[in-house]
Amino acid sequence: MTTHYIAGQWLAGQGEALQSLNPVTQAVVWTGQGADAGQVEAAVQAARQAFPGWASLSLEARIGVLEAFAGKLKARAEELAHCIGEETGKPLWESATEVTSMVNKVAISVQSYRERTGEKSGPLADATAVLRHKPHGVVAVFGPYNFPGHLPNGHIVPALLAGNCVVFKPSELTPKVAELTVQCWVEAGLPAGVLNLVQGARETGVALAANPGIDGLFFTGSSRTGNLLHQQFAGRPDKILALEMGGNNPLVVDEVKDLDAAVYTIIQSAFISAGQRCTCARRLLVPQGAWGDSLIQRLVDVSRSISVGAFDQQPAPFMGSVISLQAARALLAAQAELLGKGAVALLEMTQPQADAALLTPGIIDVTAVAGRPDEEFFGPLLQVIRYADFDAAIEEANNTQYGLAAGLLSDSNARYQHFWLRSRAGIVNWNKQLTGAASSAPFGGVGASGNHRASAYYAADYCAYPVASLETASLALPATLTPGVTL
């Protein structure tokens, strides 16, 4: 069994037994054993040994390997999309867009590296001032399950481009996607040890995060795990830690002319990927009164007809499943708890089949709920809050420990400027879905959503550190000596 990729070799695991399941059928997709602490150590050592050679390659040589990787992804795009769909439950049309994002990440990362962490020089008195960047060394990448190809890729590609070597621990829920991705790297000619794959759950993650041989850790996932990592790295300024976590994201709706456009944008913000994007709208702020009532009624009517089904269902569904039966049950429990506290079900989220992680969209009015939990419910559950005036809406939007994404649907530019100025979030959109992102922009948040290490286009910033140099080819005395020195 070839579960892990360490020092250029596919190896069986020596840790706990693992398997991934299709969330709808519960069929076994992948089986193996996780990496124990010894195998994690071997992976870190392999990366350390490979680092000098990889870092000393020219930038163009590293780009060549990355471009070959993009080519391998294209060649196996259909296989990879099927694997993503099978393991996560997301529809094939959406899985295919994820593979496209993986391919495009290479060119975007090269552009970002040249722009943000390239080399610059200029004259300074009798020397040349030069700014260059160096890789950190060996970095760990922890991947999430919701975009098991694209999101780890967003750390791995810029890290390798900068000259780092990587130990990659994917989510234990999506090991097969990680295995296929690493196969593409191997086929692209990446030297042994430059990228190492260690599969596993908590045991593997704890061993990797605590390994003294890593120079940094790049994480995308839940705030709970991210906070634990932040505590673990406290007092270690020698290690770079990049955290991209979740959010309790608000979408504020003003009285717009095009009601259906608002409804469609809300659905794309709240229910795409079965609500499993970190930028999904969790709270919908709607004005009190007749217009708000009509918006909510239209939203409920359209959401009730949203197609939900298996990843390969035809015609294709809009929503697939959530990642697991456990996740589905936790979401239903969260809905029940809110309803028990006084929330009103406008469209109750349901689980049509007890043995499948398929959930229908849920919309609940929590306006009357005292002490609403400031949590990220990672699924198709949208909370509606009615507001009396625009300033109250902004205050409620900011009433969260998180700060990932916020959005406004409004026909007024003045209101958007006011909203943008007062919003506390790393992503602020106007009349666009919260789940949309530009490849040429950073991606990250403030507060409990991250530690100011924005990813995407700004990933280059945490993959290398700046080195400032004053240089001249010959050593010579200055024209004027410092007072008090005689030669």
UniProtKB/Swiss-Prot annotation:
CDD domains: ALDH_SGSD_AstD
Keyword Lipoprotein: no
GO BP annotations listed: arginine catabolic process to glutamate; arginine catabolic process to succinate
Any GO MF annotation of the entry: succinylglutamate-semialdehyde dehydrogenase activity
Database matches in SUPFAM superfamilies: ALDH-like
EC number per UniProt: 1.2.1.71
A Pfam family it matches: Aldedh
Name of protein: N-succinylglutamate 5-semialdehyde dehydrogenase
